[in-house]
Regions:
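Conserved N-terminal phosphate-binding loop of PLP-dependent enzymes in the Aspartate aminotransferase
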Residues: 1-166
């Protein structure tokens, strides 16, 4: 949301901090029995505990200390630009989009998406299906530019391999 110029009432987070939760602005107080006043309104699979909170706090400190948010932005922009170049070269997919580590592109149909996922897998790239026709990457926060270049090379190989069979 930081990129869109809006201030949300509630934000959920998870995955990268290995724990999940929400944080909220003052508007939540408009609900008399909100989740922060009446316990057990929101629960997670594991219920949360002190160890989870300490671990999450340490992850956040490391993310801030090592400027990981800036790294993720730079690497993500590099990957999106590279995927757009591959799109122009091979015409195998459309709608390259992304922000930070959330990056995807769209195939013409579900069968082509399945073929692309298989081609990427043969190149030792794990990608995920998304929606009906899209492919998305789940990138680590500590991905380097060198890692990103390797991802793009392997994606280019997978795209060219598919283009040769069409």
């Amino acid at each position: 949301w930081q990129h869109s110029g809006v201030r949300p009432d509630v934000v959920s987070f998870g995955k990268k901090t290995q724990t999940c939760g929400i944080y909220a602005g003052s508007r939540i107080d408009e609900v008399p029995d909100n989740v922060f006043k009446l316990s057990s309104r929101i629960n997670s699979t594991w219920g949360g505990n002190l160890v989870d909170m300490v671990r999450c706090t340490q992850f956040i400190k490391i993310i801030e200390r090592d400027n990981i948010a800036d790294l993720v932005t730079k690497v993500g922009d590099y990957i999106v630009a590279g995927l757009r170049d591959i799109q122009k070269e091979t015409e195998m997919y459309t709608s390259v989009r992304g922000k930070g580590s959330l990056i995807a592109f769209t195939m013409e149909n579900p069968d082509q998406r399945a073929n692309m996922l298989q081609s990427l897998f043969k190149e030792k790239v794990l990608a995920l299906p998304c929606g009906k026709r899209s492919v998305r990457f789940r990138l680590p926060l500590v991905m380097t530019m060198e890692d990103a270049s390797e991802l793009l090379n392997r994606t280019r190989n997978a795209s060219k391999s598919m283009a040769a069979t069409v």
